[in-house]
C-alpha cells in the first residue's frame, strides 16, 4: 500500500494532522474508530467519501510511523 498517494498533511487542515486526501478525516480518527470496535463496513457506510484503500492507507501510514520511531514511553512490565 502506497499511503503517500492518499495521506496528506496540510497546516490549514486539522492543524497539519495527517488526513485522507481531499477530506478532513484524520488518520487518528480512523484508528480511533477501529480501536472502538467499528468494522470497515461501518466506516464506509458512515463516511461514503472515503474508500477501503483510504482506510488501508491510514493503517500503512501508522505502521510506518511506528516502524521508524513512533514508540511512546511506557512503564516497565512487572516481573
Say what each PLM segment does.
Residues 15, 19-20, 24-61:
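Amphipathic, hydrophobic secondary-structure cores in small proteins
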Residues 1, 9, 48, 52-53, ...:
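Intrinsic-disorder/low-complexity regions
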Residues 1-17:
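Basic, low-complexity segments
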Residues 52-76:
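C-terminal structural segments of small proteins and small subunits
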Residues 1-2, 73-79:
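Intrinsically disordered, low-complexity and often Lys/Arg-enriched segments
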Residues 7, 25, 65-66:
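Exposed, low-complexity/repetitive linear segments and helix-based recognition motifs
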Amino acid at each position: 500500500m502506497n499511503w503517500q498517494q492518499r495521506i496528506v498533511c496540510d497546516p490549514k487542515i486539522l492543524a497539519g494532522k495527517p488526513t485522507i486526501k481531499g477530506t478532513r478525516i484524520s488518520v487518528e480518527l480512523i484508528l480511533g474508530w477501529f480501536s472502538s470496535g467499528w468494522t470497515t463496513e461501518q466506516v464506509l457506510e458512515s463516511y461514503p467519501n472515503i474508500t477501503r484503500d483510504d482506510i488501508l492507507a491510514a493503517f500503512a501510514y501508522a505502521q510506518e510511523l511506528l516502524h521508524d520511531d513512533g514508540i511512546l514511553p511506557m512503564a516497565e512490565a512487572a516481573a
